[in-house]
UniProtKB/Swiss-Prot annotation:
<keyword id="KW-0342">GTP-binding</keyword>
<dbReference type="GO" id="GO:0005654">
    <property type="term" value="C:nucleoplasm"/>
</dbReference>
<dbReference type="GO" id="GO:0036064">
    <property type="term" value="C:ciliary basal body"/>
</dbReference>
<dbReference type="InterPro" id="IPR001806">
    <property type="entry name" value="Small_GTPase"/>
</dbReference>
<keyword id="KW-0547">Nucleotide-binding</keyword>
<feature type="binding site">
    <location>
        <position position="28"/>
    </location>
    <ligand>
        <name>GTP</name>
    </ligand>
</feature>
<protein>
    <recommendedName>
        <fullName>Ras-related protein Rab-6D</fullName>
        <ecNumber>3.6.5.2</ecNumber>
    </recommendedName>
</protein>
<keyword id="KW-0378">Hydrolase</keyword>
<feature type="binding site">
    <location>
        <position position="126"/>
    </location>
    <ligand>
        <name>GTP</name>
    </ligand>
</feature>
<feature type="binding site">
    <location>
        <position position="71"/>
    </location>
    <ligand>
        <name>GTP</name>
    </ligand>
</feature>
<dbReference type="InterPro" id="IPR027417">
    <property type="entry name" value="P-loop_NTPase"/>
</dbReference>
<feature type="short sequence motif" description="Switch 1">
    <location>
        <begin position="32"/>
        <end position="50"/>
    </location>
</feature>
<dbReference type="GO" id="GO:0006886">
    <property type="term" value="P:intracellular protein transport"/>
</dbReference>
<feature type="binding site">
    <location>
        <position position="26"/>
    </location>
    <ligand>
        <name>GTP</name>
    </ligand>
</feature>
<comment type="similarity">
    <text>Belongs to the small GTPase superfamily. Rab family.</text>
</comment>
<feature type="binding site">
    <location>
        <position position="39"/>
    </location>
    <ligand>
        <name>GTP</name>
    </ligand>
</feature>
<dbReference type="InterPro" id="IPR005225">
    <property type="entry name" value="Small_GTP-bd"/>
</dbReference>
Length: 254
C-alpha cells in the first residue's frame, strides 16, 4: 500500500451509484461490502441512502461514496440528479426476475444520459443462491453487457460471493487506478471510530453524529436523506458536516 495515499496526498474520493428495479437487493450488496453482513429484514428504500467506505489498495487508498437508490417507479424522477457526478454506476438485476434484467437497458441509458460516456458501468446479476429459480442465464448477462459495452459479474450478497470482486473491478477502472489489478493485495479495513450512543429521531428533526465527539453513523442501514442530508469528508481524520434544514429538500421528500 502506498504511503503517499495515506499521508502525502489527499484521499481520492469517488461516487458510486447503485441502480436497478425494486427488490434486486442493491442494499444487500452495499451492506455486505460495507459491513460484511446480511439482513433478511431490509425495508424498501424511500428516496436515497448513503454510505461511505475507505478501500486500502496496493496502489493507494481511495474513498468510496456509495449511493443506494430506490427502485420504485413512483420515485424514479428522483434518481437522475444522483447519477450526475458519479464516477461509476452499478446496475443490478435479479437473476430470478427477467423483467428486472430487461429494465437494465433503461438504467444504463439513464447513466449515459445524465452522467456522460465516462461513467464506469458494471452490470450485476444478483441472487445466484436462487439458482433453481433462475430466469436469466450467465450467457444472457454476458451477451447484454458486451452489447452495451459494460462490464459484467454475478454476485450472491447473501453469502458474499463475488461482492469484494465487484468492488475491486470498479476500483481498478476508476481514474488514476487503472494499474490496480484484481489480484492485488487489498485490505478492506475501515476507519475505526467508537460505537455511537443510540439516538432517537423526532418527527420534523434529525439525529446528527460527529466523529469529533467519538461518534459515527449507526452500524446498520438504511440512512434516510428524507429528514437529514449528510455529507462525510473522507479524509485521514474524517469530519462530518450535517445539514438539517428541511427547506433544502425537494418538495416530494417532505
Amino acid at each position: 500500500m502506498s504511503a503517499g495515499g495515506d499521508f502525502g496526498n489527499p484521499l481520492r474520493k469517488f461516487k458510486l451509484v447503485f441502480l436497478g428495479e425494486q427488490s434486486v437487493a442493491k442494499t444487500s450488496l452495499i451492506t455486505r461490502f460495507r459491513y460484511d453482513s446480511f439482513d433478511n429484514t431490509y425495508q424498501a428504500i424511500i428516496g436515497i441512502d448513503f454510505l461511505s467506505k475507505t478501500m486500502y489498495l496496493e496502489d493507494g487508498t481511495i474513498g468510496l461514496r456509495l449511493w443506494d437508490t430506490a427502485g420504485q417507479e413512483r420515485l424514479r424522477s428522483l434518481i437522475p440528479r444522483y447519477i450526475r457526478d458519479s464516477a461509476a454506476a452499478v446496475v443490478v438485476y435479479d437473476i430470478t426476475n427477467v423483467n428486472s434484467f430487461q429494465q437494465t437497458t433503461k438504467w444504463i441509458d439513464d447513466v449515459r444520459t445524465e452522467g456522460g460516456s465516462d461513467v464506469i458501468i458494471t452490470l450485476v446479476g444478483n441472487k445466484t443462491d436462487l439458482a433453481d429459480k433462475r430466469q436469466v442465464s450467465i450467457e444472457e448477462g454476458e451477451r447484454k453487457a458486451k452489447g452495451l459495452n459494460v462490464t459484467f459479474i454475478e454476485t450472491r450478497a447473501k453469502a458474499g460471493y463475488n461482492v469484494k470482486q465487484l468492488f475491486r473491478r470498479v476500483a481498478a477502472a476508476l481514474p488514476g487506478m487503472e494499474s490496480t489489478q484484481d489480484g492485488s493485495r487489498e485490505d478492506m479495513s475501515d476507519i475505526k471510530l467508537e460505537k455511537p450512543q443510540e439516538q432517537t429521531v423526532s418527527e420534523g428533526g434529525c439525529s446528527c453524529y460527529s466523529p469529533m465527539s467519538s461518534s459515527t453513523l449507526p452500524q446498520k442501514p438504511p440512512y434516510s436523506f428524507i429528514d437529514c442530508s449528510v455529507n462525510i469528508g473522507l479524509n485521514l481524520f474524517p469530519s462530518l458536516i450535517t445539514f438539517c434544514n428541511s427547506s433544502l429538500l425537494p418538495v416530494s421528500w417532505r
